[in-house]
Structures are given as C-alpha cells and as structure tokens.
Swiss-Prot record:
Belongs to the universal ribosomal protein uS10 family. Keywords: Ribonucleoprotein, Ribosomal protein. It holds the Pfam family Ribosomal_S10. It comes from Wolbachia pipientis subsp. Culex pipiens (strain wPip). Involved in the binding of tRNA to the ribosomes. Part of the 30S ribosomal subunit. This is Small ribosomal subunit protein uS10. NCBIfam families: PRK00596.1, rpsJ_bact. It comes from the Bacteria. One of its GO terms (molecular function) is tRNA binding. One of its GO terms (cellular component) is ribosome. The keyword Transmembrane helix does not apply. One of its GO terms (biological process) is translation.
Length: 106
C-alpha cells in the first residue's frame, strides 16, 4: 500500500499564498519528494452588503468582497522524515494548511 499526502493551502492574499507555496516546495525538494502541483483550485468569492447608516437611507449601502485562493499539492510516497517536517512546519498568519493522508491501492 502506498500513501499520498494531499496538502490544501488557502489564503486571502494571493501573493502571500504563492510565497508560502514556494517555501513549502523548496522544503519538500530537499527530501527529493515526488510532487504533483501546485494545482490551482477554484477561488471562492463572497460578497457582503451592509447599510451605511444604522437608521435611515436604505438606498445607501456598502459592499465588501472576500476572495479565498486555494492550491493543492500532492506528495507521493512520503518518508517518515517528510511527515515529521510537514507536522512541524509553520506558516505566516493568513495562510491555512490542511493535510490529508490517503492510502492508494495499486
């Protein structure tokens, strides 16, 4: 049985996301990891509309937008040292990392 690690990285700021991905891939390439990605996943856009005034002027509104960019990196056949490095890795504020280990039947 082989294992794959699916690493999903999310951030509000696209430039911060790309910087973290570069650092992440550089760390993995030190271990000669077999990688797929980064794969761009669909961006999630959320819009919020609020009233400017608390009492009157219903027509006066303000809109805010939040964009969440996502990338996926797949590590094939990770070693135990790679797993330890992934567990100890820290990212800057505003970047969310989700790790999933999947068994692959061949």
């Amino acid at each position: 049985m082989k294992q794959d690690i699916y690493i999903r990285i999310k951030a509000f700021d696209c430039s911060l996301l790309e910087k973290c991905i570069r650092e992440f891939i550089d760390q993995l390439k030190q271990f000669n990891a077999d990688l797929s990605g980064p794969i761009a996943l669909p961006r999630k856009d959320s819009k919020f509309t609020v009233n400017r005034s608390p009492h009157v002027d219903k027509k006066s509104r303000e809109q805010f937008e939040m964009r969440i960019s996502k990338r996926l990196i797949i590590v094939h056949n990770p070693t135990s040292t790679m797993m330890k490095m992934l567990a100890d890795l820290s990212f800057s504020a505003g970047v969310e990392v989700d790790l999933k280990v999947k068994e692959v039947n061949i």
